[in-house]
Structure formats: structure tokens, C-alpha cells
Regions:
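His/Asp/Glu-rich metal-coordinating catalytic cores
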Residues: 1-99
Length: 99
């Protein structure tokens, strides 16, 4: 699972080492939820120095966790648009176990 950029970078490396075609890629898109067993994962666009970055809202039977490597709030980013504060706010209003 990865964003378009992430999948592309990994595919290039696999080709470089003769491993292309041995891995299944699933491209994720912000706000498009993914069901994995008892978990629902929603990628959320975040502004970052690396393009195409996302955080993850992970819904489980115990509650919701927001996972992100790091984040910044930049209202005037040069590329990729600002962090999706509306979606993060929605999760905050519902309640989050951990960030």
C-alpha cells in the first residue's frame, strides 16, 4: 500500500534489482478508506517536504488512532496543498485515542 509517488519509487528500485513484477502494489488515495480485517484506515493528506504525504486514521474496535511520521501546518505550501485540517478536526471531534 502506498501513494502514487511511493509506489513509483519502490517500483523503480525493484526494477533496478531485477525484482519487478514480484510485488503487488495497492495505490492509496487521501479520503479513500481501506478495510483491513477489523480495521478501517483512512489516508489523510498532510503537508510535508516530501510530496504526496499522508497520515492515517486507523479505526479499530477499541477506538481511533491517528498515525503520521510528522506533520506541519503550512497555510501557503509551495506544492501539494495544505494539510487536510477539516478531516483531522472531524476525527478530533469524534475522539482519538492517540496521535
Amino acid at each position: 500500500y502506498g501513494t502514487r509517488l511511493t509506489c513509483g519509487l519502490i517500483k523503480n528500485k525493484l526494477e533496478e534489482f531485477g525484482l519487478a513484477g514480484k510485488t503487488k502494489f495497492v495505490e492509496i488515495v487521501p479520503r479513500q478508506k481501506i478495510k483491513l480485517g477489523c480495521f478501517t484506515v483512512e489516508p489523510i493528506h498532510v503537508n510535508h517536504s516530501i510530496p504526496d504525504a499522508v497520515a492515517f486514521a486507523i479505526d479499530s474496535p477499541a477506538g481511533t488512532i491517528i498515525q503520521t511520521g510528522d506533520f506541519k501546518i503550512d497555510y501557503t505550501p509551495l506544492a501539494c496543498g495544505p494539510t487536510d485540517l477539516a478531516t483531522l478536526s472531524e476525527y478530533g471531534q469524534k475522539g482519538v485515542l492517540a496521535l
